[in-house]
């Protein structure tokens, strides 16, 4: 879902703080958390944001794997965003930088620790590292199917030894109805997005698709 305008600048710190996977071993000192950020007023932040926090207490590592990095300097950014033609990428930033960005704009950040085994933590870290390779980190953002939330969810699902069972979503929900919940106070943004949505956006969706 999504992202913060200034946080792409912090990507330059990534190489300084990222640890090689081979140097880490599965252990209880590692913790992964899901970060859920409250929506903002800018069009790219209307739907909130999701990221993954990685902590290794043995060496005080505290990083955020953030699929919401982008450059607002991209020509015609807002127009391209509404049309679904914006490229995003995975970035890695120190957690204090990530948290302070949302604190400065008065948005809450909620954290949920993931109940993973040591082996699952190892696999999740490996998947994120693979995604961070230069040839893999950039992706074409999509409101519903490929964004910060779906990418974090997909990596968690791939790391788990088993199947994730989600609670039932609210009946009758559609992509469009959920979009309207978040754009109620931004009529022009809502209109622009509505114009780009097709008939598929009006079909009922299950709980997994409602996560976008």
Q: Where in the sequence are the language-model features?
A:
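Bacterial Sec-dependent N-terminal signal peptides
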Residues: 1-26
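Soluble extramembrane regions of membrane proteins in the secretory/endomembrane system
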Residues: 24-212
């Amino acid at each position: 879902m999504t992202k913060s305008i200034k946080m792409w600048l912090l990507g330059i710190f990534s190489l300084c703080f990222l640890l090689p996977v081979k140097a880490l071993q599965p252990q209880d000192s590692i913790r992964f958390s899901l970060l859920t950020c409250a929506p903002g007023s800018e069009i790219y932040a209307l739907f909130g944001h999701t990221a993954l926090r990685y902590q290794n207490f043995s060496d005080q590592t505290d990083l955020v794997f953030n699929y919401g990095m982008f450059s607002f300097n991209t020509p015609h950014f807002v127009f391209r965003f509404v049309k679904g033609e914006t490229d995003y990428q995975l970035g890695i930033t120190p957690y204090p930088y990530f948290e302070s960005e949302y604190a400065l704009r008065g948005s809450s950040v909620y954290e949920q620790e993931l109940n993973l085994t040591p082996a699952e933590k190892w696999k999740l870290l490996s998947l994120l590292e693979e995604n961070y390779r230069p040839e893999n980190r950039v992706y074409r953002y999509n409101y519903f199917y490929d964004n910060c939330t779906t990418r974090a969810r997909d990596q968690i699902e791939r790391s788990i030894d088993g199947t994730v069972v989600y609670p039932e979503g609210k009946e009758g929900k559609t992509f469009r109805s959920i979009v309207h919940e978040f754009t109620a106070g931004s009529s022009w943004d809502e209109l622009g997005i509505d114009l780009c949505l097709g008939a598929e956006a009006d079909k009922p969706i299950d709980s997994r698709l409602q996560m976008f």
